[in-house]
Amino acid sequence: MLSKSEIETNKVKFIEILKTALINRPGVRLENLIQALSSSDFFIAPASCKYHANYEGGLCAHSLNVYNNLMNILEMENDTTIDHESATIVALLHDVSKMNYYEPYYQNKKIYSENGSKYDELGKYDWKSVLAYKHKDSDKQFIYGNHEMNAEFIARCYIPLTVEESIAILHHMGGKSQDSAQDNLSEIYKKYPLALYLHLADMIATFVDENK
């Protein structure tokens, strides 16, 4: 869980990194992009409804984790062929389609503690109403294609993406995406290493950084 101050800190950090990376790219509608993110729930939304970073502010936190992981991978691999600007764009915006995608609700959940007033095979507990998230109805979502296609389209509305940037966003989920699994991922990752690096950075964030 993140505090309100941590959520705000992540928002400021995200915008600062994005501005620094895009300051010299021609054709960028940077202020429009920031306005679109700020007027949506991007900075307070979860990254998922059941799994990684499924809490308020989780989407922005996850995006920053992916950014940090991607920069670490590039440094570790000593790969100077990948442009820092491109790496920043795909890391911060690979999940941008998750803005306005989830909605909060409250569900009853067993909270186990030594002071619980009820008891089952796992121990003492009480029922408490806790914040949770679910997918919005499809008529309330932006739908262009699948998750990756939606993200690439939204990013492209504000940033003239290179081919490698588009491919990285489109294939950041690797074989976990049904659509991507039908493509020749090995050839894609060989030809466009940024796509592979982004996939690895995303998996590390999801299954390591946000699973502690």
Question: Which functions belong to the PLM regions below?
Answer:
Residues 49, 53-55, 79-211:
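Divalent metal-dependent catalytic cores for phosphoryl transfer on phosphate-bearing substrates
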Residues 1-120, 125-127:
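Acidic/His-rich, divalent-metal-binding segments that scaffold phosphate/diphosphate chemistry
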